[in-house]
Amino acid sequence: MRQIDLRINNMPIDPPTVVRAFLASGSLPLSRSISQVQTMLSSADYDSCDLAEHLRMDGNLAAKVMAAANSAFFSRQPCATIDDAVNRLGTLQLSRIFAQVLANAALVHPYHAYDLPAQAIWRHSIFAAVGAEMAARRKGEDRSAAYMVGLLHLIGMLVIDSLWVKKPGSPKFTLVNFAQEWSVDEIKFCGIDHPTFGAELLRQLTFPESIVKTIATQYDDPADSLSNALYVGRMSRAFRGITLKIDHCQEVIEHYDLNPESKLQSFLTDIREEAQRAMQAA
């Protein structure tokens, strides 16, 4: 993550300090149990019984875990306990559920600095998550990680928005283009963009480094399978069912075999339809 001297009202700040204060303020309504669960999931040798005990302490997370374990995809027979659910789902699915709970806490209210209503930011996130996952599936890559980076790639906007509301009279941010989005105005405001704050937030919540890195570098040229998938996710939320008017990265298009343009348009249309179904089910 690039090191930049941030200043608001001529007071220097740094991303780790801002994010620690943000989390301590309760602005992101996550229980202590949820943070402990993610810490355990990031460890390869966690104890499933201990994990189940922490899950029991958060009703929302426990309910989602039980619902997933009893879904048609996983359920060969009814799953009656949270212990059974943990063993049935495994680390990847539990991490995905955690990401959904985190996104639901962070992305369901208006972002005033960006003049975006809650429904808009949630839609952006779902479309990017579905797009990234479908891109990963196309190449047999890590679908769960792709979904996670798509779902959470805008979470740093919440941190910047919390700073913006504390500085009355600040101008609202403008979406410039696909390559930069709101980052131009974010940098004018506090010296840094939302990907850096988002990456730091996820780092402090002990997300895998691959997720953190991909969030931090989302405006750089894609350099690996996960950043390729997120690029497609971002394209998916920019697509409106007509010609996509962006100078897209040809390396990504070729990686997913999406030439000619009509093939890309067809794939983005499929993503749009799947994302709309996901929105209705959420």
Model-derived regions, located:
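Conserved alpha-helical "signature site"
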Residues: M1-K167, W182-D247
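Terminal helices and disordered tails flanking the catalytic cores of nucleotide-processing hydrolases
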Residues: M1-V19, V252-A282
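Juxtamembrane helix-loop transition sites at the ends of transmembrane segments
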Residues: C79, Y111, T174-L175, H255
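Post-HEXXH active-site segment of zinc metalloproteases
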Residues: V165-N177
